[in-house]
A protein has these predicted regions:
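Generic C-terminal helix-cap and adjacent flexible tail
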Residues: 1-2, 126-132
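Hydrophobic packing within well-folded, soluble alpha/beta domains
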Residues: 12, 45, 49-54, 66, ...
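Conserved N-terminal beta-strand and adjoining loop/helix that marks the start
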Residues: 1-18, 38
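Conserved Nudix-box catalytic region and its N-terminal flanking loop in Nudix hydrolases
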Residues: 17-55
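Short secondary-structure junctions
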Residues: 56-63
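NUDIX/MutT-family hydrolases
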Residues: 85, 94-125
């Protein structure tokens, strides 16, 4: 089975809300996800995440602590997703690849249809946010 390794950012505002982005393409169109993308060969998860947020959202983030690494089997590939707490350093999270976005608090985090691998991390993300 093909293996894909990605990094994803849980971008957290000062008020504890987190940023979610909605896919506008492909098999999982209209599902929600934490922004990020594939690691290039020899690239660290943190560097990949910084690069992907710059490419997808025209913004700079500070990558913080690892919240969880999800291992998930999609029908066509195995995904390893490293999910990091992050904060916005500059930019306005301009959507360059996604169709929609929203800020969610702990109470509303379950109100969107997450990608299956992202869904696997929701409990850990909630626990992380409760500790802030």
């Amino acid at each position: 089975m093909k293996r894909v390794e990605v990094a994803a950012a849980v971008i957290i505002r000062e008020d504890g809300f987190i940023f979610a982005a909605q896919r506008g393409y492909g098999e999982f169109k209209d599902y929600w996800e934490f922004p990020g993308g594939k690691l290039e060969e020899g690239e660290s998860a943190g560097c990949a995440l910084t690069r992907e947020i710059r490419e997808e959202l025209d913004s700079e983030i500070e990558v913080g602590s690892l919240i969880k690494t999800v291992e998930y089997d999609y029908p066509a590939f195995h995904l390893t997703m490293h999910i990091y707490a992050s904060t916005l350093v500059s930019g306005s999270l301009k959507l360059l690849e996604h169709e929609n976005s929203m800020w969610l608090d702990i109470a509303s985090i379950d109100s969107v249809k997450w990608l299956p691998a992202d869904e696997e991390a929701i409990a850990d993300i909630k626990a992380y946010l409760f500790r802030l």
